[in-house]
Amino acid sequence: MTLLCLTSGVSASPFEEGVAKYKNADYMGAINAWRLAAATGNARAQLNLGVMYAKGQGVAQDYTEAFKWSRLAAAQGNADAQYSLGVMYDGGQGVAQDYVEAFKWYRLAAEQGDADAQYSLGVMYDEGQGVAQNHVRAYTWWSLSAASGHTNAKKVRELAEKNMTSQQILEAQKMIRECQHKKLQACT
C-alpha cells in the first residue's frame, strides 16, 4: 500500500492540487484537496486518501478510514485500490482478517495486470488461504507475476518448481498460455 496515484493532467482540479501539495510535502493540503476530488467520485483521490490514512501522512494513521477510501476506489475498478483491499483483508488492517475476501480483491487486481496481486494470488494458492491449496495455480500466478515484472516472483516460482512433478509443470505452463490468451480473465 505504498502507491499513490500522482498522475497529473492539464487542468488544476482538486485532484491535481492534491498532487502538487503532496509533491511539496504539504500532506494536510493534499488530504484536503483529495477529499474534494473524492467527494465527486474520483477513484485516484479515493485511493490516495486510503494510502495516506494507512501511512499516517497528514492525518493520524487509521486503517478503518484507509479501508473506507480504498473500498470506494476499488469498487470503481481501480487495480491499486483492489490490491490494497486484498492486503487489508489478508492482514486484518482496518477490517477483520478474511482470506476469502483477500483472494477476491487480489484476483480482481491481478486480472488487470497488477504484478503484486498476481504474486499474492500465488502465495494464497500455495498456502491454501482463502482458496483450496493448488501448487499448479500458485506456479501459474507466480509465472504471470514474474512476466509482469515482480522481482521475487521468479525466485519463488523456481523454488516451487523443485517440488512439482513434470506433469504439474506442464499443466501450469498450459494454464499460463491460456491466461495470457484470455488477457488474464478467468484464470483462477
Say what each PLM segment does:
Residues A12, R44, D80, D116, ...:
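Start-of-helix register in tetratricopeptide repeats
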Residues R35-A37, L72-A73, L108-A109, L144-S145:
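Canonical positions in the second alpha-helix
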Residues P14-K21, A33, A37, Q46-K55, ...:
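Hydrophobic face of amphipathic alpha-helices that form TPR/SEL1-like repeat modules
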Residues V19-K21, G41, Y53-V59, G77, ...:
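Glycine-centered coil turns and helix-coil junctions that link the paired helices
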Residues E17, T151-T188:
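Terminal, low-structured helical/coil segments at or just beyond the last alpha-helical repeat
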